[in-house]
């Protein structure tokens, strides 16, 4: 599973405000789209005044992340930036191999 950093922003404050009832309903329903085969939302925080937020997810591939974000893009026009990231432990385990390749160059 790959970790992904998801950063979102609403194009307008009005759009952010209009999404609040739907988002509250989604959270109150237990976040039904936050976990499915090949995808698990690990953490989400929102900055509701400015209409932005950040999440960390684990997914088998970027297509699973897109599937999770699709309804929010279509329904509310939210803009997302998605980056593959690693945990501290993953970084530490990868570093020796990366350093070895860098030294060989």
Identify what each model region corresponds to.
Residues 1-105:
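Conserved, structured core segments of small domains
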């Amino acid at each position: 599973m790959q970790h992904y950093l998801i950063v979102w922003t609403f194009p307008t404050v009005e759009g952010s405000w209009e999404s609040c009832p739907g988002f509250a309903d989604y959270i109150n329903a237990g976040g039904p789209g936050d976990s499915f085969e090949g995808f698990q939302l690990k953490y989400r925080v929102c900055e509701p005044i400015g209409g932005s937020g950040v999440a960390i997810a684990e997914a088998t591939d970027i297509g699973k992340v897109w599937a999770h974000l699709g309804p929010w893009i279509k329904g509310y026009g939210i803009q997302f930036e998605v980056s593959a990231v690693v945990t501290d432990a993953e970084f530490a385990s990868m570093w020796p191999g990366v350093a070895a390749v860098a030294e060989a160059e």
